[in-house]
A protein has these predicted regions:
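Short, structured coil segments at secondary-structure junctions
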Residues: 42, 62-64, 150
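Short active-site oxyanion
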Residues: 42-47, 130, 206-207
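Conserved core of the sugar-phosphate nucleotidyltransferase
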Residues: 81-83, 101, 110-197
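Hydrophobic helical membrane-anchoring modules
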Residues: 200-202, 207-232
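A conserved hydrophobic position in a structured secondary element of the catalytic/binding core
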Residues: 50, 107, 112, 181-183, ...
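Short phosphate-binding loop-to-helix
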Residues: 53-101, 111-112
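Short aromatic-hydrophobic micro-motifs that form the base-stacking/packing surface
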Residues: 103-105
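N-terminal glycine-rich phosphate-binding loop and ensuing alpha1 helix
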Residues: 2-49
Length: 232
């Protein structure tokens, strides 16, 4: 079995300029994902998919490979990670580089470690599902969620759960925005991962942080420090 890790990292982040290579406790943010992928021992190759020369330079420094530059039409605010992965697989296949399994690992997942990737890969192989991705449990019951209308009035999505006890409600999970294992065939044939053909690897909340703002970035640093202090 040949395994490929693809790290998508476009250069046009808006809310945090240069997010993928911003400093994170003394190293570029993307370096954590590259090192975890390399140190996991799972992958035959760790490949960057980027449209940005500076990001490519940083990734090469930390051991990733960059055999192509991503097209600009796959690098705007509307381009999906799935499309970037599909494009990378197709380019590599055209270079006679064929892989059985492909993992899309986000550049913004510094809270992971090599052991998590290894455990997730083992579960992916055991389950024989098309995909396996990282997820985490919602902290609050989604059945009691509400929205505000244009007049700032409160409306529950489903009022029947207003008096339900939390322990009586079905647990809900969301994508952790960390990693996605899949067969090469599934990546090329499917455009939607969140279906019964997928399984999940549940991460605890302290290993999940969606880094979209500077506040998120600082919170991720706090979590990283706390996680590493508790490990000793």
């Amino acid at each position: 079995m040949k395994n490929l890790c693809i790290i998508p990292a476009r250069g046009g982040s808006k809310r945090i300029p240069r997010k993928n290579i911003i400093d994170f406790l003394g190293k570029p943010l993307i370096s954590y994902s590259i090192e975890n992928a390399l140190n996991s021992g799972i992958f035959d190759e760790v490949v960057l998919s980027s449209d940005d020369e500076e990001i490519i330079e940083v990734a090469l420094k930390y051991g990733a490979k960059a055999p192509f530059m991503r097209d600009k039409n796959l690098s705007d605010d509307y381009a999906s990670s799935t499309a970037a992965v599909q494009n990378a697989i197709e380019i590599l296949q055209s270079q006679n580089q064929i892989y059985d399994h492909v993992c899309c690992l986000y550049a913004t997942a510094p809270l992971l470690n090599k052991n998590i990737l290894k455990q997730a890969y083992e579960k992916f192989i055991q389950n024989e599902s098309k995909f396996l991705f990282a997820a985490t449990e919602f902290e609050y019951p989604i059945q009691r969620a509400f929205y505000l209308n244009e007049n700032n009035q409160v409306y529950m999505f489903d009022e029947k759960h207003y008096k339900s006890r939390s322990q009586d409600l079905t647990k809900a999970y969301h994508d952790a925005g960390a990693f996605y294992f899949g067969t090469s065939k599934a990546w090329l044939e499917e455009d939607f991962i969140f279906k019964p053909h997928s399984s999940v690897f549940v991460l605890p909340r302290n290993l999940v942080c969606d880094i979209d703002t500077m506040q998120d970035l600082e919170f991720a640093k706090i979590l990283y420090k706390a996680n590493h202090e508790s490990a000793f």
